Amino acid sequence: FLTISHIADQKAGMISGGQKKLVELGRTMMVDAKIVFLDEVGAGVNRTLLNTIGDAIVRLNKERGYTFCVIEHDMDFIARLCDPVIVMAEGKVLAQGTVDEVKNDERVIEAYLGRGLKNKLKEGAA
């Protein structure tokens, strides 16, 4: 399912970041978790392995009914996986909707590409 048998005999310290994330998904499957939280799946992972991870997430959702809560900055990756999308900043929901809706939301753009939410709030209070 996850095509990780080729790394079965390798020490954990010798496999790549993406391979470690695939092993983590495999461990999730072993305990049959129905809700899975993934933090920064794409961090340090090459695009090929990220696509493999994304394919596995989609299959686990469709075939086994797993629900995923994914924390990720790569909106292209998220677009493959999630609908709806919720964007948070400073511990609060900033926007929610389709990937296109949140990518074009002025608050999201300002928080992540502009001066940042904290600075904007400080300026408004002054």
What kind of region is each of these model predictions?
Residues 78-80:
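A short, surface-exposed alpha-helical micro-motif characterized by mixed small hydrophobic
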Residues 40-41:
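Walker B catalytic motif
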Residues 72-73:
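H-loop/switch region of ABC-family ATPase nucleotide-binding domains
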Residues 11-15:
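Conserved ABC ATPase signature
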Residues 1-7, 34, 55-58:
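Conserved ABC ATPase "signature" region
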